[in-house]
Amino acid sequence: MEWTGAVYADAPTVEVSTWIDAPPERVWELASDIHAVAESSQELQRVEWADGDGPRLGARFTGYNRHPALGEWSTISEVVEFEPLTVFGWAVTDPANPTSSWRLSLAPEGSGTRLTQWMQLGPAPSGLSLAISATPDKEQKIVFVRLRELEAGMTATLDHLKQRAEH
């Protein structure tokens, strides 16, 4: 990731992508399973569905997180995009004004599937906002470091899903 000088109010984004040697049906089975997504995360420790046993538009889940600098916290997310074999997206805290938004999207590519994970910070304040408030002169660095952490975590998630889908 290259330095962009972004601040939190810019609602910066991160995107990672990988090609998986498996059909979209197999990749979707894993990408739409929030438990499988959490398995490889250093930060997202576990999830619990609040409204049933799986993803659907409007379903909610609680995510339990841990970060060495930010501590432990939980969030409630709502599924805001759900098109089988295509996209699974959720907004954290408030769908109308999320603290972050996440999306896993699939596209057939050759004999396999392109899986892309995207996320956006903000626009609503989050735990990161507290760190920025404490040292506002370092906001760009704080945002950049956080985006790099998220990029590394997302890459690990896609690598994990790829390995599971291909074996």
Where are the predicted features?
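Hydrophobic ligand-binding cavity/cleft-lining segments
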Residues: 1-57
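Short hydrophobic/aromatic-rich motifs at helix boundaries and adjacent loops
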Residues: 6-9, 48-49, 74-76, 129-134
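Short, mixed-charge, low-aromatic patches
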Residues: 18, 34-35, 58-61, 113-120
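Short amphipathic alpha-helical segments with heptad-repeat character
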Residues: 21-24, 28, 144, 148-151, ...
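Glycine-rich portal/gate segments that line the openings of hydrophobic small-molecule binding cavities
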Residues: 48-101, 109-114, 152-160, 164-167
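Beta-strand/loop substructures that line and gate deep hydrophobic ligand-binding cavities in soluble
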Residues: 94-152, 161
